[in-house]
Amino acid sequence: MSKSDQLFEQARQTIPGGVNSPVRAFNGVGGTPRFIDHADGAYLYDVDGQAYVDYIGSWGPMLLGHNHPAIKAAVIKAVEKGLSYGAPTEIEVLMAEKVRQIVPSMEQVRMVNSGTEATMSAIRLARGYTGRDKIVKFEGCYHGHADSLLVKAGSGALTLGQPNSPGVPADFAKHTLTCVFNDLDSVCEAFTQYGSEIACIIVEPVAGNMNCIPPVPGFLEGLRAICDEAGALLILDEVMTGFRVSLRGAQGHYNIDPDLTTLGKIIGAGMPVGAFGGKKKVMQHIAPTGPVYQAGTLSGNPVAMAAGLTMLDLLLEPGLYEQLSAKTARVAEGLKAAAAKHGIPLAINYVGGMFGFFFTDEPEVTRYEQVTRCDMERFKRFYHLMLEEGVYLAPSAYEAGFLSLAHGDKEIEHTLAAAERSFAKLAG
């Protein structure tokens, strides 16, 4: 028995399912998870000494690769001054200013500790600002595990086959209207029926929790217009896409001006950080300046802020996102070519530093329902073949993949060679 298997068995005695987030348990692909000892650059190293080229990147934060020396140095310097104060610090001011500099729609910013906190707080603010109760989200999109958002949610909830989680009261769910991603008609229908009651639309501008589904042309622009007409707020959930699909996130890439934005993952450089922000007139409704309550013991933690501020400074390097996009395109197109060589139907989506692949005969995948029709058994086989080759993909057909700037020619060439061998075995 491997050390990973031993640790997993041990973990299941004290941790539900042996993991602290469901997708890590490998239920979506079968088998048992690899326990990680350390990481560096583009690689993960498990407790059994196996190295993997990593395409999860801690589920998105590691845009510069693991164990970046400048970020590590900033964290160590901050730790030496103290771990947490529960009082304002200069670095949280600098962090908020940096976010506003990069993402101009975020005129004011509130720091929190996770993406879930960010989306939960942004929705509460939208309800408080508009005086309305209902929200619109999209089937297959995931915005964290807050009660009002686990309604036909994607990601782990979808993989578990229970899109409505037990423990979510029906009274909460009834205020969440679920529409079809990339289908404006479904949104118009919701607003026709409930428009005066809808506080906001919340959307992943690139849906990264039903694999990777970019918006079709006109979709995000249509949401902006619908919100403007109905007096609702548009919330872009950029927890995943923020600083990943471009420096200004998806809103910069697609030229969309939201009322509120939520951030996570990259903003903390691997530390537990989230943020939400937007138009000053809306953000002024948050306590202590307004009546909408939000608070957090560790919000704006100085160690986490040091990591995040250093990350954002590094992302300002000219040409960085062009490099990242080129790397992603090389991997995505290489996977598609390798599959085609062996007669394996494969659709590919990618934007910026994120990508997704689908075992399907359909030439393009733009809807959640298409994702559910993909060949999940073939994905599971491919996943384990790649894992044996030392390539660490997301252990779920519903999760996006992520590249980092640390992925060089060596890592990409290894990945594509491994993919060709794996596709050959699938076809055999």
Swiss-Prot record:
Catalysis performed (reactions): (S)-4-amino-5-oxopentanoate = 5-aminolevulinate
Listed GO biological process terms: protoporphyrinogen IX biosynthetic process
Cofactor(s) demanded: pyridoxal 5'-phosphate
Pfam families recorded: Aminotran_3 (PF00202)
Top enzyme category: isomerase
A molecular-function term among this protein's GO annotations: pyridoxal phosphate binding
SUPFAM superfamilies linked to this entry: PLP-dependent transferases
Quaternary structure and interacting proteins, as annotated: Homodimer.
HAMAP family named in the record: HemL_aminotrans_3 (MF_00375)
Protein name, UniProt field: Glutamate-1-semialdehyde 2,1-aminomutase
The organism of origin for this protein: Aeromonas hydrophila subsp. hydrophila (strain ATCC 7966 / DSM 30187 / BCRC 13018 / CCUG 14551 / JCM 1027 / KCTC 2358 / NCIMB 9240 / NCTC 8049)
